Amino acid sequence: MRRALATLTMVFALALPAHAERPRPLGWAMDAMRAGSWDNAALIARRDGAVAVDVIEWHRLRAGRGTYAEVTDFLSRRPDWPGEAYLRRQSEEAVIREGDKAILDFFTGQGPQTPEGVLAHAAALLRADRLGEAQARLVLAWRTLPMSGNDQAKFIDAHGPLLKPHHAARLDEMLWQREHAEARQMFDLVSDADKALAEARIALQNLDGDVNALIDALPASKAGDPGLQADRFEWRIRKGYGDSAKDLMLSQSVSAAALGQPAAWANRRRALARTLATGTLGKWNIDVSRHARECLAPTDYM
């Protein structure tokens, strides 16, 4: 948000002549906006020109106050302004109210970001006889998107059979994202083994409870889970067990599959590689580097 505001401020500053000797009307408009007086803010901003008007409009749309027509008009008029993804997310309710054509148009190229948007988009796709696209959107959202218990129930009520094979994958992804409430919402939908694994991972992430007992109680099929190993590694780092953390990371650095989500390890791997650059643990550094090309994207090579 701060980066978007800073960029927008620069855009505005470059678009208008400087008058340092007196306050700009945009400043007064921003004050009115912060007070909740959106209409007054827009009127005041007109005194500062078209860019100032759109600065206020940008804020208003990002607050979820725009109609479908206002949102699409702004996006076509200011396609290069920052924060578009958030503006689009905040506008999904207005898009849904507009009906199927608007939904299909708006989400072409940039899919929905909210559970409600995903469900509405899928429904519109189904009514347009685009079954494959609808199912792909639903499964992707189910496997990746955090959502409330109410939204989760809506997904299951509407598309339960389609989503059932992906319950364990959703639980796993919520744990990678450290979305503990969303993970716990899945407990009744997965196996006892998956639930036990999730409880161990949550305890590790929270530095909570007897993690060794939880890990020891896991069935053999879950003991080598990549997400569990990532959480064990992070737990050791945070607890100050650096040497054993390095050993664990080395044991997982044999393939991308063993890491589970290589990007989740990347920062720690780079940090440890920098530490090892002194040569005090040169063999370990060489071993990790040997596996890096298999495990990380090119930008993550150590």
Predicted regions, residues:
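Alpha-helical solenoid repeat scaffolds
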Residues: 5, 10, 20-302
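Hydrophobic membrane-targeting alpha-helices
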Residues: 13-17
